[in-house]
Amino acid sequence: MKRTTYIIFGMLLTGLVVVCAGIFYASTQVTGWDNIFLDIKGEKKTVQLPQCRVIQMVAVRNIIATGEGEEKGIRMPAFGELPLKITSGEAGQGSFTYASGMDEFMTMNSVGDTLRIVFDFPNDKLEKKYQDLYWLNLRSEEMIIALPDHVQFLQTSLEAQKMTVEGLARDSLSLMVQDYATINDCNFRALTVQNGAWLFNTGKADNLHLHLNGIRSWNVNANSFHVDTEYLYAHGDQRCTLEKGECRQVVWMPQSEGASLDIKLKEAATVVVK
């Protein structure tokens, strides 16, 4: 074997050793999959909701600090593995069901006609392995709100949470979500939605009010969800697609001077300008 060949072989072997060492080191630094999640356990607990017209669900974003007390980031609680179901309250009474372990991280308080459900995960309530995570993934059983008739507006700003609304029959209701929402087997005379991504799966809404600023997407299952009139609200320039069979008519409701809507139609339609 020539000397040059020995040199090349040695360089390749050295490189392989370095790569293997790097992979081993990285594997010791990565948090295990099970450690990514904060599991919140306990028996199911149901509490009665106080009289209110508005329910807000929010999560505190705590500061992550260095050992010297300097701020190095913000911890974001993520509810991707902690879904929320909204059902109808019985006899006008509302309730909230959740895993009892959540009591350590949750408070409920009323201000005027608004009930605030606040989730907070400060360092003094977390094990060391969670304290430096910028993205705190939560995992627990489904939370359920039995919504009483007197609640007119439900707002949830919980990151990555999937909300399902099932079996509601209401004259009117307003809903705002942070991420994902599905409507199943509901009947509304008027439904207003804001933010997030929406699937109108089964049921009907005679009047569907969509605030386009903040809504990432919406999809109406025309085979099983009926909409008579869609009202589209927006500031600035907006565009959307009206799918075949999505609704009977659309009403454009500009919210600022110069607001415009670029709408793509998937079936024959009549445009009436007032």
Where are these regions (language model features)?
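Intrinsically disordered, low-complexity terminal regions
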Residues: 1-176, 182-185, 201, 209-211, ...
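Eukaryotic acidic, serine/threonine-rich low-complexity intrinsically disordered regions
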Residues: 183-187, 192, 196, 202-204
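Phosphate/pyrophosphate-binding loops and the adjoining catalytic core of nucleotide-dependent enzymes
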Residues: 228
